[in-house]
């Protein structure tokens, strides 16, 4: 299969980035090192090419009704220029994806833009079109993933860095808000969103002009490796790790994002998730920090101190900020509380660990 390439590929190649296949895209995994890039974002600023994320627009009289049917949050509360995080589930409440839904600023050609994960844009476009046709709704759904580049600038210095290059008042842009404006003279959408826990922005711009925007943001280029360690320190979900409809079927309540489920709205899984909300999930996602040496990895078993299997690791790493091995894991709800003693089986050897609330960092 031919991998999709982001518009900035040539720039990344000239910077000697290392590449990896991620969701069918050939993406930079690191430029200098994961640690250097991670620390730059935590202390100053870093920029990420996130053009592998899907971009799908919904317009027309029934745009809100359609998007509400297929996402768990309440899109009807969004004013123009606002955004919200939510889940996309099947009819049984199993997560297919997580997403940010934007209600675009006034004057935009489309009403809503939502961002599925890498490689999901085709599937989610078809899901929206199928629901539209089945219900006879009046809405236009367009997969615009190839029409935009997406660049994230994240870190304590990100607001000052971007302010110098845009005509948008970033101080007036609150978290989960989006505005239209120019970045380095390039017409763009600027959203105060991110995946790192730091102050930051995500910029959508025409792919032919992405290099101008990238070069104007003079900070450390970062790859997907640092993006992963940064999000893991915050306890953020990753599709394919913390949820997958086949390999890791989870409801939003199990995955720790039950707060995005609005049961007073008309979405496809409302009936199924009402029961989960009433009874509580049998398992929950929890943070884990190893006390012993070792790095927890996806699929490793979690046990009681006596060796009884109770769960498994979904994501794990050595935290560059904490200098400690951390992970996310599914365990029975009774164990999903901080400071419980557990074991993580690392290469056949049980390692002492304790449960942690997330985020691991205070941000």
UniProtKB/Swiss-Prot annotation:
Gene3D superfamilies in the record: Aminomethyltransferase beta-barrel domains (3.30.70.1400), Aminomethyltransferase fragment (4.10.1250.10), Probable tRNA modification gtpase trme, domain 1 (3.30.1360.120)
Any GO MF annotation of the entry: transaminase activity
InterPro entries: GCS_T (IPR006223), GCS_T_bac (IPR022903), GCST_C (IPR013977), GCV_T_N (IPR006222), GcvT/YgfZ/DmdA (IPR028896), GcvT/YgfZ_C (IPR029043), TrmE/GcvT_dom1 (IPR027266)
Keywords, ordered alphabetically: Aminotransferase, Transferase
Pfam family, one: GCV_T
Catalytic activity: N(6)-[(R)-S(8)-aminomethyldihydrolipoyl]-L-lysyl-[protein] + (6S)-5,6,7,8-tetrahydrofolate = N(6)-[(R)-dihydrolipoyl]-L-lysyl-[protein] + (6R)-5,10-methylene-5,6,7,8-tetrahydrofolate + NH4(+)
GO biological process assignments: glycine decarboxylation via glycine cleavage system
One GO cellular component, as annotated: glycine cleavage complex
SUPFAM superfamilies in the cross-refs: Aminomethyltransferase beta-barrel domain, Folate-binding domain
Top-rank taxon, per record: Archaea
EC number in record: 2.1.2.10
Classification via PANTHER family: AMINOMETHYLTRANSFERASE, AMINOMETHYLTRANSFERASE, MITOCHONDRIAL
Function: The glycine cleavage system catalyzes the degradation of glycine.
Family in the record: Belongs to the GcvT family.
Quaternary state and interactors: The glycine cleavage system is composed of four proteins: P, T, L and H.
Name this protein carries in UniProt: Probable aminomethyltransferase
